[in-house]
């Protein structure tokens, strides 16, 4: 039985990165399975969220950007676990606070209204905040989603980034009930 006795933090980080790359390269593009010896983790829970503009009016107090990374997939906006922006090319972004190799992003759509609004939104991943992260490379485009549906969007290849942005390039409000940023890590020794 092997034990983990590495003490040099940089060496450990480099080995973890190499394991992530190796694990990701063995995934089939249509496979939802996690390779043996690895765990998938939602790193968005550790992040900080922001959005272009928060909904104004009677329900503005429950429309915070951070609601989409609270770990709660409740899709009823009025329960206080969804975001809601104003209209006109809105965006929502999570700062993961460090760079990760990201394999996919899971989105939970609003379930009590307006499920069609999310269609056409782009998931962007990168290391830059230029244009609020909208200039970062694209992982996927969100197609039609059912009310309250949770769907995983796999990037064509693993993407390295600190910022994950959901951008809706039209004059419509954006609401997200959960955003999960999926990263593979070697299972603990």
UniProtKB/Swiss-Prot annotation:
Kindly state which keywords UniProt assigns to this record, in alphabetical order.
Calcium, Disulfide bond, Lectin, Metal-binding, Secreted, Signal
Q: Tell me the disulfide pairings in this chain.
A: 82-177, 113-114, 139-155
Q: Which Pfam families match?
A: F5_F8_type_C_2
How would you summarize where this protein is expressed among tissues? Gill mucous cells.
A cellular-component GO term for this protein: extracellular space
Region labeled F5/8 type C-like — which residues? 40-188
Q: Where is it localised?
A: Secreted
Tell me, what is one Gene Ontology molecular-function annotation carried by this entry? carbohydrate binding
Q: A GO term (biological process) for this protein?
A: regulation of innate immune response
| Oligomer status and interactors | Homotrimer.
According to its UniProt entry, what is the function of this protein?
Acts as a defensive agent. Recognizes blood group fucosylated oligosaccharides including A, B, H and Lewis B-type antigens. Does not recognize Lewis A antigen and has low affinity for monovalent haptens.
Q: Matching PANTHER family, A to Z?
A: FTP DOMAIN-CONTAINING PROTEIN (PTHR45713), SI:CH211-215K15.4 (PTHR45713:SF8)
| Name of the featured protein | Fucolectin-7
Lineage at the top is: Eukaryota, Metazoa, Chordata, Craniata, Vertebrata
């Amino acid at each position: 039985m092997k034990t983990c006795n590495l003490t040099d933090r940089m060496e450990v980080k480099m080995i973890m990165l190499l394991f992530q790359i190796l694990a990701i390269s063995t995934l089939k593009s249509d496979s939802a399975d996690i390779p043996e010896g690895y765990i998938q983790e939602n790193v968005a829970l550790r992040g900080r969220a922001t959005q272009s503009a928060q909904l104004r009016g009677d329900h503005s107090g429950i429309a915070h950007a951070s609601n989409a990374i609270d770990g709660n997939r409740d899709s009823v906006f009025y329960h206080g676990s969804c975001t809601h922006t104003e209209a006109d090319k809105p965006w929502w972004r999570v700062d993961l606070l460090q760079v990760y190799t990201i394999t996919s992003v899971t989105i939970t759509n609003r379930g009590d209204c307006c499920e069609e609004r999310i269609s056409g939104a782009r998931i962007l991943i990168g290391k830059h905040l230029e244009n609020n992260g909208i200039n970062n490379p694209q992982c996927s485009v969100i197609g039609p989603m059912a009310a309250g549906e949770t769907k995983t969007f796999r990037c064509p290849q693993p993407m390295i980034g600190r910022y994950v942005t959901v951008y809706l390039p039209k004059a419509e409000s954006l609401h997200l009930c959960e955003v999960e940023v999926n990263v593979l890590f070697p299972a603990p020794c």
